[in-house]
Amino acid sequence: MQFNGTLDELKTVVNELQIPCNWEHKGSYELAAFEDGISNLKLNWWPETGVLRLVGDPEVRNDVERRLKELLENR
């Protein structure tokens, strides 16, 4: 996935997933750790390249990734 906006814009999109998360700055990338109580999903974003990568439990990740892609396409 790709996102070329600002961190605040990305946070707004991620908030639309309605899954609580905490954001952390990790040097060259930003990380959103989702707190859904059932998975270990994390969203990594490299602002310089725009690369977005969702990692964690595939059972939950696939659905969240699909929803996130839809939100990004419709913004």
PLM regions: where:
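Conserved short beta-strand edge segments in small beta-sheet-based binding/regulatory domains
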Residues: 57, 71-75
